[in-house]
């Protein structure tokens, strides 16, 4: 392709498209240019993402005029080109200096909110929820589903594909001896990842693997050496935290197979079975090579052998799979541990394509998804389409200013926030409900993977602004699931319809109430409210004590109190006065566990006595708390900061304590007993300074956290990504505002990292088209707000209301190197 044509292909057009002859106005006769474009609209700005040129006569040149670059950022790069999928892609505990590891993201390919995540997997066992860690030296295969940034042993990693040559291995093998299995060492220098594309060279087989994705499927291209016995093999039993317990595969025609993989708690998975994940993945696959030499391997296990993680990683399990029986050319097979392979000769550099669609509903659903998204065979076109989807999604926020690394961190963070909650429907609108029956709807997209304890804090407040329809979908998914499964309550950590019970609290309530208060109401409000009230009543404080005794009593009392307050706020908005009074009173539960003698929150027993105070005092991790200590958890009274300050001894004392909390924090922000940005309980704390009349400290510390806790590197996330939460915090804080208390419409203001942040508003939920945050005098050491204007008028508040944002307009900050202790003080 000539240079000008390749340039045209990637230009983003914001105005009319003009096509004319280079001698326009002089030539005689007809000159033809056929220009075909796929158009999509971003806030009424036309974007051309793919241009096919067919020049019918020599001497004809197509030139396009453009008015705006709507999917390009500073420097002419597409927004998707700023994404670095390796940020956070490690589970390494030594790097993290804690057992919880670092980001735990995956480096493979996904589309925004897509059902599939096509990614390399380096490990099956351990606390490696994404199935991948960068420092691992071998790859087991490439799966079609993954979880992003989670702990607790993970799940998915289904349909593990591996291109191989030579003898057939039915077991994955061990990392220390990869030659004894189908896994392979790989060339780290060859490993490449970007939005829409992943590639690596498997050195044991001299095969180059390339991956891309569609919303319901994945495309893999393998480049082989010359070999009489090249192969694609698929471990149908594989699962990140265990195994599927039953599988089925059948040959459809000379190029296609289909089947399913049944995953239950008996096979480990989410929480090693404790998360109660129970699902079936259906697949439909077409190969570019005919199925001539193919077969299925089937392993049998000793009677009584379990199928959970400890069994799957045992020598006995490995030996049973190594001895698997191989059946050649079966029409179909079903069993407890199956794998499929197809073999073929290849010449040097020969490429073999494999296209797969999945469904959680049925075989027919998988085939329908395939026909809708995977008809073509052009691998590059699939890559470009995936990148184009990310260009569109990432253009919800456009930034200028900052360094190249900061822009990469920003757009990678935004990318990570748009993986979940993923679409759980087929293209037909069908999905499996909480009653295990198939339902169909076009009213909303059924969504799944809700890491509630994490994402109510920043992730969903962010999506309320930039993707309110996704939030509306999620709320409909909450409501229908609670109705379908007959519980009438919301789950705190939902995974593929499973109520896993992971963590604590009632975060779905906060998500729904925050959305309702911000005008997102496309669901049955009365039913949603009824389920919220039932959730708070059934899953919360001890009904007679009014607090949670023992165990994780500090975390439970504080968090359940906040969620009760959320119900009270919603009741008040719905004119349910009696309910409002009840739940607002329950929101004061924090007062019942504050020990005046210790000056802090303390575990209280059921008889009203205090539990023993630990030797480390409020720095004792797990004392009454979930994944934190009382010093960290104790700041969580976001709905009544003034009441919290009162019982803690007043503003001056609290402010001094809060400053000490941050000053004792290690600057790399890895797991620590003070401001532990590596975990969620403290994510609101930097914004407390605004409420304490010291907004310049919010400005200072958010800038420090953005600079030191986030990096354009493998260790660029100081803690688990947690399904978008860690990244969403960065997006909001670096843009200059973040909520302290979801359920309120107030956002706390701080100093933006970037010179300009432009947020595209959804006109279905907003009056304005865009909200822009701009800065003057911005620099790495100029983090203090000197003054501000909102739509040209002086603005002296350290907060802004949601209504001011969705109305559209511009918030302008003048920044300086010294604090202005008069601006924004309440």
Segments from the language model and where they lie:
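Accessory carbohydrate-recognition regions in carbohydrate-active enzymes
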Residues: 74-558, 566, 571-592, 598-601, ...
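Beta-strand-rich recognition domains
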Residues: 771-777
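Ser/Thr/Pro/Gly-rich low-complexity, intrinsically disordered segments
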Residues: 8, 19-23, 82
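ATP-dependent phospho-/nucleotidyl transfer catalytic cores
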Residues: 563
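Bacterial Sec-dependent N-terminal signal peptides
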Residues: 1-4, 22-75
């Amino acid at each position: 392709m000539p240079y000008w044509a390749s340039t045209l292909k990637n230009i983003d057009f914001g105005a009319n498209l003009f096509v004319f002859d280079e001698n326009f106005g002089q030539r005689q006769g007809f000159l033809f240019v056929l220009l075909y474009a796929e158009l999509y609209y971003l806030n009424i700005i036309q974007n051309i993402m793919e241009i096919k040129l067919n020049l019918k006569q020599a001497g004809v040149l197509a030139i396009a005029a453009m008015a705006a670059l709507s999917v390009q950022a500073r420097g002419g790069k597409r927004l998707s080109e700023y994404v670095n999928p390796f940020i956070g892609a490690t589970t390494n505990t030594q790097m993290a200096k804690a057992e919880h590891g670092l980001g735990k993201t995956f480096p493979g390919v996904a589309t925004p909110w897509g059902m599939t995540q096509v990614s390399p997997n380096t490990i099956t066992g351990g606390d490696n929820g994404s199935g991948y860690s960068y420092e691992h030296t071998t790859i087991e295969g490439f799966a079609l589903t993954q979880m992003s940034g989670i702990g607790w042993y993970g799940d998915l990693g289904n349909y593990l594909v591996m291109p191989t040559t030579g003898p057939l291995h039915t077991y994955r093998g061990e990392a220390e001896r990869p030659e004894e299995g189908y896994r392979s060492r790989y060339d780290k220098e060859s490993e490449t990842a970007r939005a829409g594309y992943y590639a690596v060279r498997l050195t044991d087989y001299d095969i180059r693997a390339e991956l891309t994705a569609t919303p319901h499927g994945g495309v893999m291209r393998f480049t082989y050496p010359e070999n009489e016995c090249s192969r694609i093999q698929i471990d149908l039993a594989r699962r990140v935290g265990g195994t599927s317990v039953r599988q089925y595969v059948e040959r459809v025609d000379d190029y296609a197979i289909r089947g399913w993989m049944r995953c239950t708690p008996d096979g480990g998975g989410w929480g090693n079975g404790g998360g109660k994940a129970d699902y079936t993945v259906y697949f439909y696959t077409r190969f570019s090579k005919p199925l001539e030499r193919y077969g299925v391997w089937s392993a049998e296990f000793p009677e009584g052998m379990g199928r959970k993680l400890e069994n799957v990683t045992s020598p006995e399990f490995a030996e049973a799979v190594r001895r698997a029986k191989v059946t050649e050319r079966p029409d179909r097979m079903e069993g407890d541990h199956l794998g499929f392979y197809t073999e073929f000769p290849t010449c040097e550099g020969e490429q073999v394509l494999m296209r797969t669609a999945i469904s959680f509903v049925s075989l027919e659903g998988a085939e329908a998804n395939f026909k809708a998204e995977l008809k073509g065979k052009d691998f590059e076109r699939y890559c470009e389409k995936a990148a184009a989807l990310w260009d569109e999604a990432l253009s919800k926020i456009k930034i200028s200013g900052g360094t190249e690394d900061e822009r990469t961190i920003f757009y990678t963070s935004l990318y990570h926030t748009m993986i979940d909650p993923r679409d759980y429907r087929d293209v037909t609108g069908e999905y499996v409900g909480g009653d295990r029956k198939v339902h169909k709807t076009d009213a909303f997209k059924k969504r799944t993977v809700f890491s509630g304890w994490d994402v109510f804090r920043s992730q969903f407040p962010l999506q309320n602004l930039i993707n309110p329809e996704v939030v509306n979908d999620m709320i409909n998914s909450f409501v229908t699931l609670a109705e379908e499964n007959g519980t009438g309550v919301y789950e705190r950590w939902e995974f593929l319809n499973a109520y896993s019970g992971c963590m604590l609290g009632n975060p779905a309530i906060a998500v729904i109430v925050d959305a309702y208060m911000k005008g997102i109401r496309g669901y049955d409000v009365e039913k949603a409210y009824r389920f919220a009230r039932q959730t708070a009543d059934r899953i919360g404080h001890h009904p007679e004590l009014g607090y949670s005794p023992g165990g994780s009593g500090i975390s439970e009392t504080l968090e359940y109190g906040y969620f009760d307050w959320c119900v009270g706020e919603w009741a008040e908005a719905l004119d349910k006065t009696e309910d409002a009074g009840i739940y607002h009173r329950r929101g004061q539960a924090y007062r019942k566990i504050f020990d005046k003698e210790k000056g802090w929150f303390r575990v209280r027993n059921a008889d009203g006595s205090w539990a023993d105070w630990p030797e480390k005092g409020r720095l004792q991790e797990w004392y009454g708390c979930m994944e934190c200590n009382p010093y960290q958890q104790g700041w969580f009274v976001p709905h009544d900061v003034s009441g919290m300050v009162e019982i803690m001894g007043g503003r001056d004392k609290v402010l001094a304590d809060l400053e000490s909390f941050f000053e004792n924090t290690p600057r790399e922000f890895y797991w620590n007993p003070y401001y532990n940005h590596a975990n969620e309980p403290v994510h609101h704390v930097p914004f407390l300074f605004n409420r304490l009349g010291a907004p310049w400290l919010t400005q200072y510390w958010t800038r420090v956290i953005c600079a030191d806790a986030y990096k354009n590197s493998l260790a660029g996330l100081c803690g688990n990504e947690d399904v978008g939460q860690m990244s969403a915090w960065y997006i909001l804080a670096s843009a200059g505002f973040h909520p302290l208390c979801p359920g309120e419409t107030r956002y706390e203001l701080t100093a933006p990292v970037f010179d300009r942040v432009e947020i595209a508003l959804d006109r279905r939920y907003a009056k304005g088209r865009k909200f822009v945050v701009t800065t003057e005098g911005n620099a790495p050491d100029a983090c203090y707000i000197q003054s501000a204007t909102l739509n040209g008028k002086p603005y002296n508040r350290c907060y802004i209301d949601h209504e001011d944002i969705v109305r559209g307009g511009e918030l302008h900050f003048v920044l300086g190197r010294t604090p202005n202790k008069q601006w924004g003080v309440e």
